[in-house]
Regions:
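TRNA-recognition modules of translation machinery and tRNA-sensing kinases, especially anticodon-binding
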Residues: 13-261
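Short, positively charged and aromatic/hydrophobic N-terminal segments
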Residues: 7-11
Length: 261
């Protein structure tokens, strides 16, 4: 049904049929709802980050290949170092993951006077991230991730496994299975790759682990008293899993045929 609106004597015809959410938005909303039901709150952060929040505070070594120009979109400056009063590099970078939200949230939590003895941090952080890499059917220069962080007293690997298993049971179905494999990420120790069983095979789905003590200390949290776990997964990958879209680039081409999903 068509309706019309008259503005300054000009008639604008409008289709009253409702629009449709993009598949990435649909899946993000589903994940936020599920994690919300599990007790997580949503935290957000800027897409343009500092070198400190994106790398240094997350225990990423100075010579780590992720910092190379061919992997990261660094923002041009006048070439002079940008350092704060604590000696942290404020060199701007388009964030390469949603993990910087961990640092920002933990610092704000401590600075606000909150106490981990009384309250456990449990957040998710969905958002867009950027990688300076060639695009193909499974890679894009921009994509979406969701970060999870829990910090408190006596947080264990069992808590991590139970949280992820419960999420996938709600997201995929009650028969969902996960498999944990040892891996390495500088911001967690130990680190894990998490595979999810889809049909008769396991698919690599996300990275996770217990928050590295250095990361907790960099955020102002005593790592001898508190522990935590973190995980990060690609939302686009879950969109492909749910919809069967064969090429991640289809999600960002503005093609209205994507509305079929």
């Amino acid at each position: 049904m068509l309706a019309f609106l008259v503005i300054f004597g000009i008639i604008f015809y409008m289709n009253e049929s409702k629009g449709k959410l993009h598949p990435v938005t649909q899946i993000t909303n589903d994940m936020v709802r599920i994690f919300g039901d599990m007790g997580f709150s949503v935290a957000m952060g800027p897409e343009m980050e500092t070198e400190w929040n994106n790398f240094d505070a997350l225990n990423v070594p100075g010579d780590h290949p992720a910092r190379d120009m061919q992997d990261t979109f660094w923002i041009k400056t006048d070439g002079k170092p940008i350092i704060d009063e604590l000696g942290h590099s404020l060199r701007p970078v388009m964030r390469t993951h949603t993990s910087p939200v961990q640092i920002r949230y933990m610092q704000e939590f401590i600075n606000s006077g909150k106490n981990l003895e009384d309250e456990t941090i449990a957040i998710i952080a969905p958002g867009k991230v950027f990688r300076n890499e060639a695009t193909d059917a499974t890679h894009e220069a921009q994509f979406h991730q969701i970060e999870g962080l829990v910090v408190g007293k006596n947080i264990t690997m069992g808590d991590l496994k139970g949280t992820l298993l419960e999420f996938f049971k709600r997201f995929i179905g009650p028969d969902a299975e996960i498999r944990l494999r040892p891996s390495f990420f500088p911001f967690v120790e130990p680190g894990l790759e998490v595979d999810v069983k889809v049909g008769d095979r396991f698919i690599e789905m996300l990275g996770a682990g217990l928050v590295h003590p250095n990361v907790l200390e960099n955020a102002g949290i005593d790592s001898t008293q508190y522990s935590g776990f973190a995980f990060g997964m690609g939302i686009d990958r879950l969109v492909i899993l749910k919809t069967g879209i064969s090429d991640v680039r289809y999600l960002y081409q503005g093609d209205l045929r994507i509305n079929q999903f």
